[in-house]
UniProtKB/Swiss-Prot annotation:
A single MF term (Gene Ontology): ATP hydrolysis activity
Listed name of the protein: ATP synthase subunit beta
Alphabetized UniProt keyword annotations: ATP synthesis, ATP-binding, Cell inner membrane, Cell membrane, CF(1), Hydrogen ion transport, Ion transport, Membrane, Nucleotide-binding, Translocase, Transport
Disulfide bond annotation, renumbered to this chain: none
Protein EC: 7.1.2.2
Record lineage: Bacteria, Pseudomonadati, Pseudomonadota, Gammaproteobacteria, Pasteurellales
Organism name: Haemophilus influenzae (strain PittEE)
Catalytic activities: ATP + H2O + 4 H(+)(in) = ADP + phosphate + 5 H(+)(out)
Membrane topology: Peripheral membrane protein
Encoding gene, per UniProt annotation: atpD
Length: 457
């Protein structure tokens, strides 16, 4: 191992000088004698490399000895990581002792080649009505949960992990990228209480950590997911929040002295996003289905960060503040959310017709709202009155009590099969439940519960 010394420290960016014949490669991990790990980002010439610190640079000083490990950052992978919380370097931070690692993989890997990739159109049932109906997930697809602050991205994600672990008994990897430590803690205890902790690996790089950690923690989680996939499993990979990954890239880019591009983002925004997203894919051995929470700055979907993310996704689940303000949770906007799987050749004609019928009625209701606001319901034709009545039932029937939100709602969570979901909405569209009051449709699971609830009203 060749040794160098620190020559300059600017916040999280550290310049290290090595002998001319032993300059580290880009992405090599370096170890400072204080125990801090650095990752080489640029070679400046004259034996000097510019690195990003994967940890706080407090207490560092010029002249400290730095050793080159001659390898990129390597993290433990395999079943020993399940039920554990790790940091960006794969070190345990849950005070449960060392991780008995089976093997270590480098976090920088190339994406699978074209011939290794598989294209599956198999659906992944989530048990959440609005998602299964309007924006179904593909096994091995990429899903984005879009929403501003406080509309329920993390709760939706927790419900998905719980449903996949319990109903499909699959493994999940959760990468907490630049989110609140409190959320990470809640998440851990929620998984523990739901008895699914032994099926989830948790990798955290929280808000208060340096930008290097937040930039690399998604790759650490992805590497663990790739290991499960290459063992022939169908694995779920959750990222909360992909926007913070971009933001960390912006911070690092500015510190490295690159010129900013639109809205101050890094010039390499599309490439950095591609490096992560291209590795999240299904091969002939197994699949990675990824669910990514995407914070939308100022609710503006045209911001370069969410806009770049859109290009990679198969399904987009858009959470809306208007729907949340009506008290309808999950606050998924059925008119804004899309899925490439919603195609009669993939989901079947019946599912497609019901989903489009639901969207059609909700769209018509949206148009009629202005007329109702000005002239009142009485001015509508009988046909339009029926549309409004059915739309309001559909709106309420799209809500659902979550298992992970039982504390807030006070009602037990419900998992609804796709068959029951289609049956329920088809019945509403065909007018079978026109006689039932709309309150009966609010916060229930299947249509049978609606009928049960209506009897007691």
């Amino acid at each position: 191992m060749s040794a160098g010394k620190i020559v300059q420290i600017i916040g999280a960016v550290i310049d290290v000088e090595f002998p001319q014949d032993a300059v580290p490669k880009v992405y090599d991990a370096l170890k400072v004698e204080s125990g801090l790990t650095l990752e080489v980002q640029q070679q400046l010439g004259g034996g000097v490399v510019r690195c990003i610190a994967l940890g706080t640079s407090d207490g560092l000083k010029r002249g400290l000895k730095v050793e080159n490990t001659n390898n990129p950052i390597q993290v433990p992978v395999g079943t020993k990581t399940l039920g554990r919380i790790m940091n960006v370097l794969g070190e345990p931070i849950d005070e449960q002792g060392a991780i008995g690692e089976e093997e270590r993989w480098a976090i920088h890997r190339s994406a699978p080649s074209y011939e290794e990739q598989s294209n599956s159109t198999e659906l992944l049932e989530t048990g959440i009505k609005v998602i299964d109906l309007i924006c179904p997930f593909a096994k091995g697809g990429k899903v984005g949960l879009f929403g501003g602050a406080g509309v329920g991205k993390t709760v939706n994600m927790m419900e998905l992990i719980r449903n996949i672990a319990i109903e499909h008994s699959g493994y999940s990897v959760f990468a907490g990228v630049g989110e609140r430590t409190r959320e990470g803690n809640d998440f851990y205890h929620e998984m523990k209480d739901s008895n699914v902790l032994d099926k989830v690996s948790l990798v955290y790089g929280q808000m208060n950590e340096p930008p290097g950690n937040r930039l690399r923690v998604a790759l650490t989680g992805l590497t663990m997911a790739e290991k499960f996939r290459d063992e022939g499993r169908d694995v779920l990979f959750f990222v909360d929040n992909i926007y913070r990954y971009t933001l960390a890239g912006t911070e690092v880019s500015a510190l490295l002295g690159r010129m900013p591009s639109a809205v101050g983002y890094q010039p390499t925004l599309a490439e950095e996003m591609g490096v992560l997203q291209e590795r999240i894919t299904s091969t002939k051995t197994g699949s990675i289905t990824s669910v990514q929470a995407v914070y939308v700055p100022a609710d503006d979907l045209t911001d370069p960060s969410p806009a770049t993310t859109f290009a990679h996704l198969d399904s987009t689940v858009v959470l809306s503040r208007q729907i949340a303000s009506l008290g309808i949770y999950p606050a998924v906007d059925p008119l804004d959310s899309t899925s490439r799987q919603l195609d009669p050749l993939v989901v079947g004609q019946e599912h497609y017709d019901v989903a489009r019928g639901v969207q059609g009625i909700l769209q018509r209701y949206k148009e009629l709202k202005d007329i109702i606001a000005i002239l009142g319901m009485d001015e509508l034709s009988e046909e339009d009155k029926l549309v409004v009545a059915r739309a309001r039932k559909i709106e309420r029937f799209l809500s659902q009590p979550f298992f992970v939100a039982e504390v807030f709602t006070g009602s037990p969570g419900k998992y609804v099969t796709l068959k029951d979901t289609i049956r329920g909405f088809k019945g509403i569209l065909e007018g079978e439940y026109d006689h039932i009051p709309e309150q009966a449709f609010y916060m229930v699971g299947s249509i049978d519960e609606v009928l049960e609830k209506a009897k007691n009203m």
